[in-house]
A protein has these predicted regions:
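A short, polar/charged loop-to-alpha-helix boundary motif
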Residues: 50-60, 368-380
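Active-site-proximal alpha-helical segments within enzyme catalytic domains
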Residues: 115, 161-168, 252, 256-278, ...
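Catalytic-site signature segments of enzymes, centered on catalytic residues
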Residues: 61-62, 121-204, 242-260
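Short, conserved catalytic-motif segment at the N-terminal edge
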Residues: 3-66, 87
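Active-site Gly/Thr loop motif
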Residues: 208-262, 290-354, 390-399
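Hydrophobic (often cysteine-bearing) scaffold residues that line and stabilize catalytic clefts
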Residues: 10-14, 65-69, 73, 109, ...
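Active-site helix/loop module of the DD-peptidase/beta-lactamase fold
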Residues: 59, 64-68, 82-124, 142-143, ...
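Active-site SXXK
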Residues: 12, 18-19, 38, 62-89, ...
């Protein structure tokens, strides 16, 4: 198995685990990147990008990163907050008056970021391809009735998060979510990362290999149960196979359609690990990063995912569910002030401010879970161990 790229000798453990993912854990094509104090110390890739065409995973290969996109979308909202243009504690209707229908008038922007708004799905089935029609999706969300009283429960907004937060970004900035992200994050940082992929980049996109669903897991059982919030998740005009298509890549789905690689995802988080700036590019300030790091919502049972979750205004926090019963063990083991987001099947990106480290892993063979699996976690573990950290079964990294 050939691994390409570069790795600082101090982080050789990451390179070793990356190779083991291919040799022992079924990896097909992937990339991993780590930055320390804004400098890249790991930038590796390898494997096959498209098993049907037998194309190699190249240096510039990119792939859909599913819910890692939520981190990019949340960052856009935080940028507007840092600039004084968006009050995260304000009601959504301050910026989006039409949203205040059907019992949603008191929902705040903070509730959207915390997955507490109760608009975790759309009950009415939408026509195929609706996910690519922003106005249609926004109108459907304006009409939707909350599944629970807003602010009283935490329930992961698997797809609706992107349109809800993205529309706030659009109303405040005057730009679409994808354009705002390009103008304020991707282009200033010089990264290959799109929410709404240009057609000329399409040949570089790796083809995802979907995992068999965990049919015995409680979350998947609920998908098959009529009239549950889980059963309505894909009432957005497309299933996962359609999201990983040209039309899905082109759509600005702020919860799921981001296209990048580990290099781009890690570099997006690099300034967030370093006080808000990378070189001459200032993204946010230290106070904003503290808000990103602080746990703002947590629950013993997420109303949608049915597992314990912890969030920090749009970002996932470290959560150790490994001792939970079978089917409830979705986990991400990070340092305590780290924040980021995992993507369905195993991709992940995060910032660890104490360590001044950013990390990202992307791949095309999806695992069955909705957070990281043994491939991603082994790389995360190796990065922390390279910095001299140790972990115990409590999931706490110590040095």
């Amino acid at each position: 198995m050939s691994i390409f790229g570069r790795c600082d000798p101090k982080f050789q453990q990451v390179a070793d685990e990356f190779e083991q993912n291919f040799l022992e854990r079924g990896e097909v094509g992937a990339s991993v990147s780590v930055t320390i104090e804004g400098e890249t110390v790991v930038d590796l890739w390898g494997g096959t990008a498209n098993t049907e065409l037998q194309t190699k995973w190249e240096e510039d290969t990119v792939s859909i990163v599913w819910s890692c996109t939520k981190g990019a979308t949340a960052l856009c909202a935080h940028i507007l907050s840092y600039r004084g243009e968006l009050d995260i504690d304000a009601p959504v209707i301050k910026y989006w008056p039409e949203f205040g229908q059907a019992g949603k008038e008191n929902i705040t922007v903070k509730m959207l970021l915390n997955h507490q708004a109760g608009i975790a799905a759309i009950r009415k089935p939408l026509p195929e391809g609706a996910y690519g029609d922003w106005d249609r999706m926004i109108h459907a969300l304006e009409e939707e009735v909350p599944f629970w009283e807003p602010g009283t429960r935490n329930g992961y907004h698997a797809l609706t998060f992107g349109w809800l937060v993205g529309e706030v970004v659009r109303r405040v900035s005057g730009k679409s979510l994808g354009q705002f992200f390009q103008d304020e994050v991707a282009q200033p940082l010089g990264i290959d990362f799109w929410i709404g992929l240009p057609e000329d980049i399409e040949p570089r996109v790796a083809k995802m290999i979907l995992a068999e669903p965990q049919i015995d897991a409680p979350f998947y059982k609920k998908i098959l149960e009529p009239n549950t919030v889980q059963s309505f998740i894909f009432n957005t005009g497309g299933l996962m196979e359609q999201f990983d298509s040209r039309s899905g890549h082109a759509a600005e789905i702020g919860a799921a359609s981001g296209i990048t690689n580990a290099r781009g995802l890690a570099r997006m988080y690099a300034p967030l690990a370093c006080g808000g700036s990378l070189g001459d590019v200032k993204i946010v300030d230290e106070e904003t990063i503290q808000r990103m790091s602080f746990v703002s919502s947590a629950t013993g049972q997420d109303a949608n995912l049915l597992v314990p979750t912890r969030f920090s205004l749009g970002f996932m926090k470290s959560i150790d569910n490994r001792k939970q019963p079978q089917g409830f063990q979705e986990s991400i083991i990070l340092s305590e002030d780290a924040f980021g987001h995992a993507g369905n099947g195993g991709s992940i990106g995060f910032a660890a401010p104490t360590e001044k480290m950013s990390f990202a892993y992307t791949m095309n063979k999806m695992g069955a879970g909705i957070t990281v699996n043994d491939r991603g976690q082994s790389l995360i573990d190796a990065a922390y161990k390279s910095l001299g950290y140790k972990s115990d079964r409590s999931g706490t990294w110590m040095r």
